[in-house]
Amino acid sequence: MDIKKLPKEIIEGRRLKREEDLRFFATANLEELCQGADNIRKVLCGDAVNLCSIINGKSGKCSENCKFCAQSSHHHTGIEEYSFLDTNLIVEDCKKHANKGVHRYSIVTAGRELKGKDLQVACDAYKRMKEECDIDLCASHGLLSEEAFIALKESGVSMYHENIETSKRNFPNICTTHTYKDKINAIKLAQRLGFKVCSGGIIGMGETFEDRLDMAVSLAELKIQSIPINTLMPIKGTTYEDLEPLTEDEILRTVAMFRFINPTANIRLAAGRSLMEDSGRRAFHAGANATITGDLLTTSGNNIDKDKEMLTQMGFHL
């Protein structure tokens, strides 16, 4: 494919499909690739940037064995473990982020599935945030039942987050306590019940570039419109503690590729921005138009005010 002509074709309506040979993304000139992705973003998405923030609502002791995760009970990382946070604390944190201009706020909890008392506590918190905070609500609570999804919906949650993490082929290499199909089923159930879905994955876990391509295409097939791209920051005590972090060029190539394959989605920089110069500034000229701002789950994130200042200087509208 001609990387110089492809952006115009995508802007005019072409969509890249699984059956096409997309391996050229791995070797295309990086500057041309990023410029093309930026042009697609400008025309199809405009200059609006979407900011979201999260709070780690319930930390550690997770039954699942995801090799990248500091919260898995299969790892010994020394992270702080605690049961569900107090509702007042969550609501006050949400207000703080809303007042800073963040667009969406999510409680994220460790564990395969939120249920029982913890689900009720979460729903109570979402109801209060819906009433007291001027912000859209997202939730990230694992592989939920239909009843749990409905409870969240009735509590004011409009978006659900469930990463597919990697390609279908590679998924068994990173987790064996649940399956790729479990993830897809949860996403489709959330969509059927009327949720917008935020879903992406993690790069830098030893996967091939073809795995990243497959993940990008799978998300396009699922019609996902918010795609977080996390770059692995190896955490001591996890299976992946000794993996070499990706270079900035590798991250930029992946971000740009995701924009070509998901041209109208919010491509959201998530964990790993610190691996890039100036908090990933170049990635916002390579197709990204959204980010998680503030602290993350078990790693420090980016300062909200500094993010807003940088993005405004770059010509984005908040």
From Swiss-Prot:
Disulfide bonds listed in the record: none
Keyword Iron: yes
Catalytic activities: (4R,5S)-dethiobiotin + (sulfur carrier)-SH + 2 reduced [2Fe-2S]-[ferredoxin] + 2 S-adenosyl-L-methionine = (sulfur carrier)-H + biotin + 2 5'-deoxyadenosine + 2 L-methionine + 2 oxidized [2Fe-2S]-[ferredoxin]
CC cofactor note: Binds 1 [4Fe-4S] cluster. The cluster is coordinated with 3 cysteines and an exchangeable S-adenosyl-L-methionine.
Binding positions for [4Fe-4S] cluster per the UniProt entry: 62, 66, 69
Entry keywords, A to Z: 2Fe-2S, 4Fe-4S, Biotin biosynthesis, Iron, Iron-sulfur, Metal-binding, S-adenosyl-L-methionine, Transferase
A GO MF term: iron ion binding
Cofactor needs: [4Fe-4S] cluster; [2Fe-2S] cluster
Ranges where the Radical SAM core domain occurs: 44-270
GO biological process terms, semicolon-separated: biotin biosynthetic process
EC number: 2.8.1.6
UniProt: [2Fe-2S] cluster binding residues: 106, 138, 198, 268
Pathway stated in the Swiss-Prot or TrEMBL entry: Cofactor biosynthesis; biotin biosynthesis; biotin from 7,8-diaminononanoate: step 2/2
InterPro entries according to UniProt: Aldolase_TIM, BATS_dom, Biotin_synth/BioAB, Biotin_synthase, Elp3/MiaA/NifB-like_rSAM, rSAM
Quaternary structure, from the entry: Homodimer.
Family, per entry: Belongs to the radical SAM superfamily. Biotin synthase family.
Function per UniProt: Catalyzes the conversion of dethiobiotin (DTB) to biotin by the insertion of a sulfur atom into dethiobiotin via a radical-based mechanism.
HAMAP family: BioB (MF_01694)
The protein's name in its UniProt record: Biotin synthase
